[in-house]
Amino acid sequence: MHNNILIAGAGIGGLSAALGLARKGMRSIVLEKAPELGEIGAGIQLAPNAYHALDALGIGEVARQTGVHVDKLLWMDGMTDKEIASVPLANRFREFFGNPYAVIHRADFHGLLVEACHKTGLVEVRTNAEVVDYENFPDRVEAILHDGSCINGAVLVGADGLWSNVRQKVIGDGDPRVSGHTTYRSVIPAEDMPEELRWNMSTAWAGEGCHMVHYPLKGGKVFNLVLTSNSGASEPEAGVPVTTDEVFEKFKTMKRRPTSLIHKGNNWKRWVLCDRDPLPNWVDGRVTLLGDAAHPMMQYMAQGASMAIEDAVCLAFELGREMDPVSALKKYNRARFARTARVQTYSRYASDFIYHAKGGAAAMRNELMGGMTPTDFFQWINWLYGKETVEKYK
């Protein structure tokens, strides 16, 4: 029998898929290349659409309890130290969208998924098990691991991230696009955060060709710092240690308040961001893609994790109601492509128009965003944050 669903990758997308499948009564084997489970990075922003999907997976309440519910989304002009716009996230926001906006430590969130999967009794996770290839057969798919061993299943889901091995056979489109944007990350204790910036908000400082983001994590005990510049970098990097001086040099044109944070950070690390153009087909027979393997996106809409969780809910819905797995995967692909492509495209656009604008473009941004009321924002972003998408997958 080949009833197990095989999932390559035990990150947020892969475990969300396993949990969604378990809620439909389906067993899965999650194949993770790392020697142990874990997540790299600090913070994740969870908008209401992520929580709608987490509710469908049965862990919305525990995720709401674990996250930090920030009071506002705040955009500041880092060149003038003046507010561009803000959106309150309290009662009106929650009533409009049906869920909160929160930030959560990536490791804490991953831990919630691991625990939830374990409790189902239907999810097996194997480490040191990198999927490097696969073969489709009429009645099964065979996942081929790095050590040459093979595992058979009804379906293979490539949730193996930006540098997905599974994608290279499903689509074969080579390496991701190097964006030329470099991100620096650090986490600082709350007591080291300047009191004038110790805000319970997700704050973005927009500069010329750069921006800075900070928000609290772990119940406000630490602050996550994420700084991004249009560096023109042409080679991918991930987690390279760098000096504080290097970071300051990239952002020194901004005002004192935002740049004062740079010297509060320590153990700065550097990433060069990559994404891909939207492509409409993620399916090859009994194999499909999910999350960053399917639609990697820039960080500017803070939707990478959210889209992966939505993918998981949709995939479980289609596999749960369709006897033919090949047909189910095609329906999943069709259901998810337009939405994820829109977020990929908007994420690129937001970097130029909102976060890194210069001169007249920055002035236009300030005028347009500053003129929006909270209701204007709610209505504009409802296509993304609203319940309608996940409601289709129930």
UniProtKB/Swiss-Prot annotation:
<dbReference type="InterPro" id="IPR050493">
    <property type="entry name" value="FAD-dep_Monooxygenase_BioMet"/>
</dbReference>
<dbReference type="Pfam" id="PF01494">
    <property type="entry name" value="FAD_binding_3"/>
</dbReference>
<dbReference type="GO" id="GO:0018669">
    <property type="term" value="F:3-hydroxybenzoate 6-monooxygenase activity"/>
</dbReference>
<keyword id="KW-0058">Aromatic hydrocarbons catabolism</keyword>
<dbReference type="InterPro" id="IPR002938">
    <property type="entry name" value="FAD-bd"/>
</dbReference>
<comment type="similarity">
    <text>Belongs to the 3-hydroxybenzoate 6-hydroxylase family.</text>
</comment>
<keyword id="KW-0520">NAD</keyword>
<comment type="function">
    <text>Catalyzes the NAD- or NADP-dependent conversion of 3-hydroxybenzoate to gentisate. The affinity of the enzyme toward NAD is twice as high as for NADP. The enzyme shows higher specific activities against the intermediates in the degradation of 2,5-xylenol and 3,5-xylenol, 3-hydroxy-4-methylbenzoate and 3-hydroxy-5-methylbenzoate, respectively, than for 3-hydroxybenzoate. It also shows activity against 3-substituted benzoates.</text>
</comment>
<keyword id="KW-0560">Oxidoreductase</keyword>
<protein>
    <recommendedName>
        <fullName>3-hydroxybenzoate 6-hydroxylase 1</fullName>
        <ecNumber>1.14.13.24</ecNumber>
    </recommendedName>
</protein>
<dbReference type="GO" id="GO:0071949">
    <property type="term" value="F:FAD binding"/>
</dbReference>
<comment type="subunit">
    <text>Homotrimer.</text>
</comment>
<keyword id="KW-0285">Flavoprotein</keyword>
<keyword id="KW-0274">FAD</keyword>
<keyword id="KW-0503">Monooxygenase</keyword>
<keyword id="KW-0521">NADP</keyword>
<dbReference type="InterPro" id="IPR036188">
    <property type="entry name" value="FAD/NAD-bd_sf"/>
</dbReference>
<dbReference type="GO" id="GO:0009056">
    <property type="term" value="P:catabolic process"/>
</dbReference>
